[in-house]
């Protein structure tokens, strides 16, 4: 599976930051670790304001764990491959159910359904304790942000949507 990165673009564009969290690719969501690459001036600006956005500094355990995660390239590769495979499977299944979405290489699918409003789907999913994001904002108010979970989580989502959409045509 092909993986792409925008890292090479930071040499070309001095206003570009490439940001990566450890949440999915390194299975460390609770530790709130991430990094940014880009123009040194932009990185300095980030350092100047970082406590305004995240007042929780990383303790020694978090730092050691983060370094170990970066060094474990095999786990990172395996996790990314699983996320990509699950995402591609879910996109195929969602498309078969009538969803559309932009082509993306992210860890989420920004989907809309041709005949069922996103808000209705969102509320039905929430009743089943299946959580996706819904933003009641102009231009995106008929879209769901579906984070790529485990294969089992995505199967649960798809199975529910199959039943729900069958009954709501």
Residue ranges and their predicted role:
Residues 1-7, 26:
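Conserved PLP phosphate-binding loop immediately N-terminal to the Schiff-base lysine helix
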Residues 83-84, 93-128, 144:
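Conserved PLP-binding catalytic core of the aspartate aminotransferase-like
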Residues 124-128, 133, 137-169:
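PLP-dependent enzyme catalytic core of the Aspartate aminotransferase-like
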Residues 3-4, 19, 115-119:
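Structural motif corresponding to alpha-helix initiation and N-cap regions
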Residues 37, 110-112, 147-149:
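Short hydrophobic/aromatic beta-strand micro-patches
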Residues 8-16:
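Nucleotide-activated donor-binding/catalytic signature segment of Leloir-type glycosyltransferases, i.e.
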Residues 30, 105, 139-142:
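Short acidic/glycine-enriched loop/turn segments that link adjacent beta-strands
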Residues 15-94, 99-102:
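PLP-dependent aminotransferase class I/II
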């Amino acid at each position: 599976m092909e993986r792409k990165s925008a890292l090479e673009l930071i040499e070309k564009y001095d206003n570009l930051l490439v940001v990566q969290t450890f949440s999915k690719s390194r299975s460390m969501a609770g530790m709130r670790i991430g990094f940014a690459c880009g123009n040194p001036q932009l990185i300095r600006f980030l350092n100047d304001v970082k406590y305004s956005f995240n007042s929780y500094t990383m303790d020694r355990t978090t730092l050691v764990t983060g370094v170990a995660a970066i060094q474990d390239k095999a786990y990172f590769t395996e996790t990314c491959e699983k996320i990509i495979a699950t995402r591609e499977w879910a996109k195929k299944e969602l498309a078969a159910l009538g969803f559309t979405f932009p082509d993306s290489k992210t860890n989420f699918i920004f989907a809309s359904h041709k005949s069922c409003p996103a808000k209705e789907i969102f509320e039905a999913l929430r009743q089943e304790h299946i959580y996706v994001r819904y933003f009641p904002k102009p231009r995106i108010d008929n879209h769901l942000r579906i984070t790529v979970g485990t294969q089992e989580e995505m199967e649960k989502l798809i199975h529910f949507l199959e039943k729900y959409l069958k009954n709501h045509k």
